[in-house]
Regions:
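PLP-dependent amino-acid enzyme catalytic core
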Residues: 1-176
């Protein structure tokens, strides 16, 4: 699903995004996390600061929300073929976790400079990893090329309505607290 949104230099909020956020499937995999008062930070900034504890998610990041929502909303045919993405960190783990949960084949292209702990974390979820390029842009270019050649769905880390809607559930959760 692609939403047509005019690009005008600033992000335009849309009722369509709010509708997508309301219909997300993220709680099939994401945990409901608390909001905690940050005493030390509040003192330092002379203001009340609260933290949404997304570090308590299975991958220690909110990125699981967007990745899972996008992948869970693929067609059965797309899911059967598998997915591909590029990332050097939390998005890769979110995609790998979602694919394990949904039993979908997954290949993640990561720069050769990715810390070994991140690579191991992705492999722990059962995803295949290809190390390519010295930076994210090179890895991403390779992943997009491979997705086209193999007719796999490329899972965007941020520039996709379903990914944005999944990640937007953080705001929804904060508003209900």
């Amino acid at each position: 699903m692609r939403l047509k949104i005019k690009k005008s230099g600033s992000f335009k909020y849309s009722k369509k995004y709010l509708d997508l956020i309301a219909k997300t499937k993220v709680y099939d995999v994401a945990e409901k996390t608390p909001i905690s008062f940050a005493g030390n930070l509040s003192s330092k900034l002379k203001n009340e600061v609260y933290l949404k504890r997304e570090d308590m998610q299975p991958i220690f990041s909110f990125k699981i929300r967007g990745a899972y929502n996008k992948i869970a909303n693929l067609t059965p045919q797309q899911q059967k073929r598998g997915v591909l993405t590029a990332s050097a960190g939390n998005h890769a783990q979110g995609v790998a976790n979602a694919c394990k949960k949904l039993k979908i084949p997954c290949l993640i292209v990561m720069p050769v400079t990715t810390p070994e702990i991140k690579v191991k974390s992705v492999r722990r979820f059962g995803s295949k990893v290809l190390l390519h390029g010295d930076n994210f842009d090179q890895a991403s270019k390779k992943a997009i090329q491979m997705a086209k050649e193999r007719k796999l769905e490329f899972i965007e880390a941020f520039d996709d309505p379903m990914t944005i809607a999944g990640q937007g559930t953080v705001g929804k959760a904060v508003s209900y607290t």
